[in-house]
């Protein structure tokens, strides 16, 4: 419901980079894509906007979801933004309300295995490094650094 307003904000600040968290919270629980899909596509028209593949499990039926429940939503995001403007995110610790950390991250990590290497590298680290102006890890290239989440 915030995407139309977000598009107005982005239009006003064309030089400001923006990240859409949690795919802008589509209605995964209800298996709906509209109007989210159309609104997201309009926002993706702005080159200064990226989208995070995160927060999906809390939009699904808690602890009852399957990885493939999220594929069509990730397909829509990749089609709208392109892999160069999509990044992985964890939504930790909130994601643990609906699944464990490893399973939550595994949704995106497993999904991107079907993509070409360059797209995988962008989603799993490259887009994030460019957006935040940081260098990818020298040990892993643009792959994310694996670590245990910090305890609260």
Locate the predicted segments by residue.
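Divalent metal-coordination and catalytic microenvironments
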Residues: 22, 51, 91, 120, ...
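Short Gly/Pro-enriched loop/turn and capping motifs at secondary-structure junctions
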Residues: 57-58, 92-95
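Catalytic pocket-lining loop regions of alpha/beta-barrel enzymes
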Residues: 1-87, 135-142, 146-152
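Mid-to-C-terminal alpha-helical segments outside catalytic/metal-binding sites
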Residues: 76, 80-87, 96-152
């Amino acid at each position: 419901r915030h995407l139309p307003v977000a598009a107005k904000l982005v239009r006003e600040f064309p030089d400001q980079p923006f990240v859409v968290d949690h795919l802008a919270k589509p209605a995964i629980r209800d298996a709906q894509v509209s109007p989210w899909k159309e609104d997201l596509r309009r926002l993706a028209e702005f080159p200064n906007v990226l989208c995070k593949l995160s927060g999906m499990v809390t939009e699904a039926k808690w602890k009852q979801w399957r990885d493939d429940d999220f594929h069509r939503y990730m397909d829509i995001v990749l089609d709208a933004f392109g892999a160069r403007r999509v990044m992985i995110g964890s939504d930790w610790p909130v994601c643990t309300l609906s699944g464990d950390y490893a399973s939550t991250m595994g949704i995106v990590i497993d999904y991107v295995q079907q993509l070409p290497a360059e797209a995988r590298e962008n989603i799993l680290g490259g887009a994030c490094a460019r957006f935040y102006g940081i260098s990818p890890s020298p040990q892993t290239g643009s792959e994310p650094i694996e670590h245990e989440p910090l305890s609260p």
